[in-house]
């Protein structure tokens, strides 16, 4: 994984996030809070363990994982998922599976920004972060 991912990132733009949350099955009240949140994402690495911490006024979440190894995750909207994150062509690709459903979250670096692309049932959400 590129060390360029490491550090603190702040959300600067979000496109289609409400539709993505709807596709996930997130309720109206939680979607409203999620749309208002402007999270910071802190990515760190210790040995071969990567940690992604998301902090916002809505909720803080943290996942720690090894690339290519499945782990259990409780998401900000309280889904209990089996997740796996791999590194492909410089991008961190995450697959979350729960209740027979699946979503993908791809994190890639473009022009010094972290572009996060979330896909669920044909809905695509793009969130862009800048390094703090």
Swiss-Prot record:
InterPro entries linked to this entry: Calycin, Fatty_acid-bd, ILBP, Lipocln_cytosolic_FA-bd_dom, Myelin_P2
Family from the record: Belongs to the calycin superfamily. Fatty-acid binding protein (FABP) family.
Protein name: Myelin P2 protein
GO cellular component: cytoplasm; myelin sheath
Cell compartments where the protein resides: Cytoplasm
Biological processes annotated in GO: membrane organization
Main location: cytoplasm
UniProt keyword annotation of Acetylation present: yes
Binding site for (9Z)-octadecenoate: 107, 127-129
Domain remark in the UniProt entry: Forms a beta-barrel structure that accommodates hydrophobic ligands in its interior.
N-acetylserine: residues carrying this PTM: 2
């Amino acid at each position: 994984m590129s060390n360029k991912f490491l550090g603190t990132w702040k959300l600067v733009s979000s496109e289609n996030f409400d539709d993505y949350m709807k596709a996930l099955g997130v309720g109206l009240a939680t979607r409203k809070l999620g749309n208002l949140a402007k999270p910071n994402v802190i990515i760190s690495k210790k040995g071969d363990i990567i940690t992604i911490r998301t902090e916002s006024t809505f909720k803080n979440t943290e996942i720690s994982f090894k690339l290519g190894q499945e782990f259990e995750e409780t998401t900000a909207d309280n889904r209990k998922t089996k997740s796996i994150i791999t590194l492909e062509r410089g991008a961190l690709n995450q697959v979350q599976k729960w209740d027979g459903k699946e979503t993908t979250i791809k994190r890639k670096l473009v022009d010094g920004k972290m572009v996060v692309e979330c896909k669920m049932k044909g809905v695509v959400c793009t969130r862009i972060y800048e390094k703090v």
